[in-house]
Amino acid sequence: LCEGLARAAQGAGAQVHPGGTYLCMEGPQFSTRAESELYRSWGAHVIGMTNLQEAKLAREAEICFATIALATDYDCWNHSAGDVEIEQVIKVLSDNVKLAQRIIRGAVRHFPPERSCACATALKDAIITERAKIPKKARKELKLIIGKYL
């Protein structure tokens, strides 16, 4: 998935940096200069506010997931880039939406019809409760996501 997205991003004209560490912070807000320096010292490459939850939920739903992190600004550690201005972020965000659409259009053409990755069975060992002790109501509510394990 990641390789296909990287190829599609390059094909859409994006500058691509495969890999990296994503730091999820509480938002909506911009980092202070001290926070920004701390995140850099930890080795964070991208700072955002939503990706952690999305990645966890995708794993729990056994959905293949990869991040396309389209930067809107340099965090405030980069003194030469100046302070982050909301108007600039909104403009770049708008451009990034169009770029993301091109990337996704290019990527979906190359996805295999069947998956053979571990994502499809990520929950196979997650249920510890004896199956007989799982109430009918809970089974019904969870059927869509974990029905194959019940």
Task: Please report, for each region that a protein language model flagged, where it lies by residue.
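Glycine-rich phosphate- or other oxyanion-binding loops that anchor nucleotides, phosphorylated ligands
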Residues: 1-79, 87, 91-94, 104-108, ...
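Short amphipathic alpha-helical/adjacent loop interface patches that line ligand
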Residues: 97
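Short, conserved interaction/coordination micro-motifs, predominantly
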Residues: 100
